[in-house]
């Protein structure tokens, strides 16, 4: 298995730390006036999602994590697992609630949304939905003419249950595009 020395550390690198796959978020090289140089590294545990800080002496090395990102289509949810299929090999994978985290509120069944799934030893660690999704509004207050003093918007419930702030002119039953990274309304879809 490959290993990375401290001079190869950079954000996004996936390494093994204490038997857990981690992604490096930040790496700072510190050379004090006296003593040995070291790296102050901020890592995210890919299994638990926790962020931890660790220091490594210059010259230390970490084993590379056998983590693979793959794009798969979302199929359906059976109540316990979310099922995904590889678009070319038709291989299917199921992810549990911990791997899904917040992605559940952006995925609609039979939408064939292309999600990025992080796999470790063949098991899904995390699921990232597409950057933009198009969902129908199931519930929102009607926009009242002249009610623009606040300038903001109004909450709207989407067909997946997610709640997004939309402009006052958007009505119930319309389809909107939402940015899944921020949860913000982007535009109406005709």
UniProtKB/Swiss-Prot annotation:
Its main location: cytoplasm. Gene3D superfamilies: 2.30.30.30, Nucleic acid-binding proteins. The keyword Mitochondrion does not apply. The modification N6-(3,6-diaminohexanoyl)-5-hydroxylysine is found at residue 34. SMART domains: EFP, Elong-fact-P_C. One of its GO terms (molecular function) is translation elongation factor activity. GO terms for biological process: peptide biosynthetic process. May be beta-lysylated on the epsilon-amino group of Lys-34 by the combined action of EpmA and EpmB, and then hydroxylated on the C5 position of the same residue by EpmC (if this protein is present). Lysylation is critical for the stimulatory effect of EF-P on peptide-bond formation. The lysylation moiety may extend toward the peptidyltransferase center and stabilize the terminal 3-CCA end of the tRNA. Hydroxylation of the C5 position on Lys-34 may allow additional potential stabilizing hydrogen-bond interactions with the P-tRNA. Pathway: Protein biosynthesis; polypeptide chain elongation. It is found in: Cytoplasm. InterPro entries: Elong-fact-P_C, NA-bd_OB-fold, Rib_uL2_dom2, Transl_elong_fac_P/YeiP, Transl_elong_KOW-like, Transl_elong_P/YeiP_cen, Transl_elong_P/YeiP_CS, Transl_elongation_fac_P. CDD domains: S1_EF-P_repeat_1 (cd04470), S1_EF-P_repeat_2 (cd05794). Keywords: Cytoplasm, Elongation factor, Hydroxylation, Protein biosynthesis. It comes from the Bacteria. One of its GO terms (cellular component) is cytoplasm. NCBIfam families: efp, PRK00529.1. Belongs to the elongation factor P family. Involved in peptide bond synthesis. Alleviates ribosome stalling that occurs when 3 or more consecutive Pro residues or the sequence PPG is present in a protein, possibly by augmenting the peptidyl transferase activity of the ribosome. Modification of Lys-34 is required for alleviation. This is Elongation factor P. The gene is efp.
């Amino acid at each position: 298995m490959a290993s990375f020395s401290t001079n190869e550390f950079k954000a996004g690198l996936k390494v093994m730390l204490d038997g857990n796959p981690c992604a490096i978020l930040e790496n700072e090289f510190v050379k004090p006036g006296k003593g040995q140089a070291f790296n102050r590294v901020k890592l995210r545990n890919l299994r638990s999602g926790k962020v931890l800080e660790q220091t490594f002496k210059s010259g230390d090395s970490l084993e590379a994590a056998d983590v693979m990102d793959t794009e798969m289509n979302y199929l359906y949810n059976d109540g316990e697992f979310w099922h995904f299929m590889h678009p070319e090999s038709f291989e299917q994978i199921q992810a549990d609630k911990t791997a899904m985290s917040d992605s559940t509120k952006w995925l609609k069944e039979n939408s064939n949304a292309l999600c990025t799934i992080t796999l470790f030893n063949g098991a899904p660690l995390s699921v990232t939905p597409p950057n933009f999704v198009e969902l129908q509004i199931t519930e929102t207050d009607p926009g009242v003419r002249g009610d623009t003093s606040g300038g903001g918007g109004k909450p709207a419930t989407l067909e997946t249950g997610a709640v997004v702030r939309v402009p006052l002119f958007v009505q119930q039953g319309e389809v909107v595009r939402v940015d899944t990274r921020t949860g913000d309304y982007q535009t109406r879809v005709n």
